[in-house]
Amino acid sequence: MIIAFQLAVFALIATSSILLISVPVVFASPDGWSNNKNVVFSGTSLWIGLVFLVAILNSLIS
């Protein structure tokens, strides 16, 4: 169970880092938002899902 928690936290950190870099690049590029809107929404949905997964796993471990 601890390994699953650690992997979920690592995935959350990796997703956060990727979104931290990619979202400003998408907004700064011309026509970037209209072309990459689905990618940004998918990444944000993945991030929200990982936050809930980490919270659930944390409550099971503690």
From Swiss-Prot:
SUPFAM superfamilies: PsbZ-like (SSF161055). The keyword Membrane applies. GO terms for cellular component: chloroplast thylakoid membrane; photosystem II reaction center. One of its GO terms (biological process) is photosystem II stabilization. Pfam families: Ycf9. It comes from the Eukaryota. Keywords: Chloroplast, Membrane, Photosynthesis, Photosystem II, Plastid, Reaction center, Thylakoid, Transmembrane, Transmembrane helix. It is found in: Plastid, Chloroplast thylakoid membrane. May control the interaction of photosystem II (PSII) cores with the light-harvesting antenna, regulates electron flow through the 2 photosystem reaction centers. PSII is a light-driven water plastoquinone oxidoreductase, using light energy to abstract electrons from H(2)O, generating a proton gradient subsequently used for ATP formation. Belongs to the PsbZ family. This is Photosystem II reaction center protein Z. It comes from Calycanthus floridus var. glaucus (Eastern sweetshrub). The lineage of its organism: Eukaryota, Viridiplantae, Streptophyta, Embryophyta, Tracheophyta.
